[in-house]
């Protein structure tokens, strides 16, 4: 019997008008045995032509797209790229600034799956190493997600190249066991998310009527500057006012508290009620902010009154924290695989057996409404 040929390597197009950035990205990506940079381009028009001529035996799985480029910029090219191939996974690479942050969120609205800030100092080995870890993990997670959705095999990368936890888990074969939903109306809602999270979180909050008694705590893996922009976007786009959390802030109902970039967000009891504490303790799950420390602190304050939702994201951040939530008699809901951009975080939680429900994204808000009205999940 003939051995089947190995699956084609993950195909990547790098599109940036800076030759220095293209060189950095290409050197990082080509160092991975399961990656192949199909093209290194300097404007969006070239990316369109490259994608139009892609062949099945040499697929383009991921495009790394700059925003500001001559001839055709990234925001102009993005909808045309997705019209050519709706399955291609676009990651926007941008500088860390307010203007670039707003453009990155616009790209997410147009269909990009994720964004990644370019390294601040390309001469700093630590900065480049941290960027490498994030870039490789995101490219691999999104490429694997694309190929699974298309029923295509994908090559396995070397384990040591991705120090973050496995970005995505194998497709579920049997339904994970579910726990009974604890009785009682939730007193606080915690949400954790990563890759694909901005779109999912906005969709959830747009569908969830504001509840004046309910505070919502969100940890989304996101760099500084971007979190403030995202908080503004949540406030403008949903029923819920959102604020980037700061030290000592008193918790009130009807408000969304977003973990600030590069800080863990915790909640502590005080004589005047729950208060926000932000911390630069070490990263957890290679992340800061991380979901696990937020959940541990919330479980200690709210106990059985805490309801947790884990949305799309790579890695397994939130799994350990959800175990603490359940031990404190709280409840956990995970987004299902079919509607997740990357079923890493929710998949890890689902497989751990702590969920009371595993739901498609459109069903999460109606379920929360029923729970807030005293019904069953």
Predicted regions located by residue number:
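Conserved acid/base catalytic micro-environments in cytosolic active-site loops
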Residues: 2-14, 18-34, 45-46, 50-53, ...
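Short beta-strand elements in bilobed, periplasmic/extracellular small-molecule ligand-binding domains
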Residues: 36-38
């Amino acid at each position: 019997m003939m051995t089947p040929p190995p699956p084609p390597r993950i195909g990547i197009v790098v599109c940036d008008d800076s030759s220095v950035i293209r060189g950095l990205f290409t050197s990082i990506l080509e160092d991975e045995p399961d990656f192949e940079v199909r093209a290194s381009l300097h404007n969006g028009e070239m990316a369109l032509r490259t994608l139009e001529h892609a062949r099945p035996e040499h697929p383009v799985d991921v495009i790394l797209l700059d925003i500001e480029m001559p001839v055709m910029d990234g925001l102009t090219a993005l909808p045309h790229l997705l019209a050519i191939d709706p399955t291609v996974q676009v990651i926007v690479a941008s500088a860390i600034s307010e203007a670039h942050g707003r453009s990155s969120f616009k790209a997410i609205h147009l269909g990009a799956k994720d964004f990644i800030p370019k390294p601040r100092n390309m001469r700093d080995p630590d900065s480049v190493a941290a960027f490498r870890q994030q870039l490789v993990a995101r490219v691999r997670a999104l490429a694997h997600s694309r190929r699974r959705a298309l029923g295509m095999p994908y090559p396995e990368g070397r384990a040591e190249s991705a120090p973050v936890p496995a970005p995505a888990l194998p497709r579920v074969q049997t339904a994970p066991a579910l726990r009974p939903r604890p009785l009682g109306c939730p007193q606080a809602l915690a949400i954790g998310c990563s890759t694909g999270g901005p779109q999912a979180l906005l969709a959830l909050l747009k569908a969830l009527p504001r509840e004046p008694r309910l505070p919502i705590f969100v940890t989304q893996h996101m760099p500084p500057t971007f979190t403030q922009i995202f908080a503004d976007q949540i406030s403008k786009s949903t029923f819920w006012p959102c604020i980037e959390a700061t030290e000592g802030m008193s918790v009130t109902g009807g408000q969304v508290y977003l973990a600030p970039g590069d800080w863990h967000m915790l909640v502590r009891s005080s004589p005047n009620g729950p208060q926000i504490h932000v911390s630069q303790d070490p990263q957890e799950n290679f992340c800061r902010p991380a979901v696990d420390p937020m959940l541990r602190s919330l479980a200690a304050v709210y106990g059985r009154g805490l309801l947790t939702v884990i949305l799309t994201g790579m890695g397994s951040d939130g799994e350990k924290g959800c175990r603490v939530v359940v031990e404190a008699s709280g409840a956990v809901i995970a987004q299902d695989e079919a509607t997740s951009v990357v079923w890493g975080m929710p998949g890890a939680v689902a497989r751990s057996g702590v969920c009371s429900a595993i739901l498609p994204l459109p069903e999460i808000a109606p379920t929360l409404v029923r729970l807030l009205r005293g019904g069953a999940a």
